[in-house]
Amino acid sequence: MEVENGTRENVEAVLKEMLQRKSFSKYKFVLISMHPEELRHLENRQVRVETRVWYGDSRKALRRFAWLKLRAAMIIDENLQIQKKASNTIHVYLSHGSPVKSIRESYNCTPDTDYMLSQAPFWNPINEYELRIPVERMVTLGFPRNDALFSDKSDLLNLFDQKFNKLVVWYPTFRQHRIHEAVIPQHSSFSIPLIHDEAAARRINELAAQYGILLVVKPHPVQDLSLIRELQLDHLIFIYDDFFVSNGITAHDFLGKTDALITDYSSIIFDYLLTGKPVALTIEDYEQYKEQQGFAIDFKMLKSCSTILDTPEDFAAFFRDLVEGNDPLKEKREEVMRLTNTYLDGNSTKRVVDWMEELLQRPR
């Protein structure tokens, strides 16, 4: 099982469900990660954590990795795929989100992928083109991670010291990589839409405070956070992957308890639509993205069901509507939600593991 921080919620949900079932007690689970130290707490007699191996590593490590792949009954991944070595191994790609941005030139399913989870039939031709995987290999059962959106972890809002009436989470797409240059060059030293300097950040913080909003920004895992970390504001705060780890929750546990989402070109929007809560988009660099990376979908669909934020005044109006309970785009969001999500019941993990259990019982 491939487990990487920031894109591991589907795999973790499946692992937890499997460990609870007697039918999986005969299997050993090997978690492969570039950051194994983050997963040591999961180890027991049935679960082992090992370091991801790459070409150029020691021969001993490469032989060990090859041996594990040869012995695997099933390979389960959702980001950095692990190619199988034995023809009777079942390779399932759980996906880490339905594509908004075009990824055809940067990310594809490996040819040995036997099955891929598709969020809904709507996505099948899109996944086929973007990920270069045949439609007949796609299975629609729902994303396991989305079950957490329906969970009842009522204590999550006690994770912050600030007092607030509404909690809004902001998921911006990365624009400034820690190592490489940004995919889309930005004039913002903060690398977040509409927050181009400290003054802009303070203005949005003031508006959030005015309406009793706690605005929590979750930057992309690979984004350069060096300047953002220096901000010390009371109603515009930043959280990182370690926030979820240290509090023993997943990103989707947290998402389910928020009151609204702000994002841009992230696939998280299609998951969040399941909550029925308001969504806003910050897309000031839309034309750049469209020209340089392109989109996997017709972006008009997202514009039609989301509030567009271009100025601080737009933030103020969005906050005001949220506090006053005005939701003019509710019906349109539901329409898009039903198009892009087949399952709305919070039982996707069970469905996926039931299906995997049946796969493993087939003659191979």
Language-model regions: role of each:
Residues 51-57, 237-246, 304-318:
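Short acidic-hydrophobic, aromatic-tinged amphipathic segments that line or gate anion-handling sites
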Residues 56-68, 72, 222-267:
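Donor nucleotide-activated moiety binding/catalytic core segment of transferases
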Residues 232-234, 267-340:
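Catalytic binding pocket for nucleotide-activated donors in carbohydrate/polymer assembly enzymes
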Residues 74-95, 99, 247-293:
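A donor-sugar binding/catalytic signature common to diverse glycosyltransferases
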Residues 345-364:
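C-terminal alpha-helical cap of glycosyltransferases
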Residues 1-150:
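Active-site and donor-binding regions of nucleotide-sugar-utilizing enzymes
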Residues 100-104, 111-195, 221-222, 324, ...:
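A nucleotide-sugar donor-handling region in carbohydrate enzymes
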Residues 29-47, 170, 201-244:
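Catalytic donor nucleotide-activated moiety binding site of glycosyltransferases and closely related
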